[in-house]
C-alpha cells in the first residue's frame, strides 16, 4: 500500500508536518542568532533574528536579542524600536523600560529617557536602578 502512495500519492505534506517544520526552522534561526550574538558576530545575529521574527513576531525573546545586537552595532534607533514593541506587549517589565532609558540616553534623546524613567518609577519607585 505504501508503494502506491509513494507512486500515486500527493507530494504535499500534511499541515501538522508543515507546522512542525516551521517551528523547527524558527528555533534554528533563533538559536543561531543567539549563538552569533554571543560570538560577537552581530551582523549574522541580526539576519537570523530578523528572519525568526518574520516567522513568529510574537516571540519577545527574539526581539530582546535583536535589540542587544542592534545596540552592539550602534543601530540605536532600531534597538529602541524593538524595545518599544516589547514594552507594548509587557508594559510592566522594568528591565525593558530600563534598557529603553539607556538606549534613549545613548541616542541623546533626553525627553524620551525621562518619559521611560517616569513609567518605570510609577511601576517600582523603590527600585534603585530606576
Report residues per predicted region.
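Alpha-helical segment of the N-proximal tetratricopeptide repeat
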Residues: 19-55, 61, 65, 71-72, ...
Amino acid at each position: 500500500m505504501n508503494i502506491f502512495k509513494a507512486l500515486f500519492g500527493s507530494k504535499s505534506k500534511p499541515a501538522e508536518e508543515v507546522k512542525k517544520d516551521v517551528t523547527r526552522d524558527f528555533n534554528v534561526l533563533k538559536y543561531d542568532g543567539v549563538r552569533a550574538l554571543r560570538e560577537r558576530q552581530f551582523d549574522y545575529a541580526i539576519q537570523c533574528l530578523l528572519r525568526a521574527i518574520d516567522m513568529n513576531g510574537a516571540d519577545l525573546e527574539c526581539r530582546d536579542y535583536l535589540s542587544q545586537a542592534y545596540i552592539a552595532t550602534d543601530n540605536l534607533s532600531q534597538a529602541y524600536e524593538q524595545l518599544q514593541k516589547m514594552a507594548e506587549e509587557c508594559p510592566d517589565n522594568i528591565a525593558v523600560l530600563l534598557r529603553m532609558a539607556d538606549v534613549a540616553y545613548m541616542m541623546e534623546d533626553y525627553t524620551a529617557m525621562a518619559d521611560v524613567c517616569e513609567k518605570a518609577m510609577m511601576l517600582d519607585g523603590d527600585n534603585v536602578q530606576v
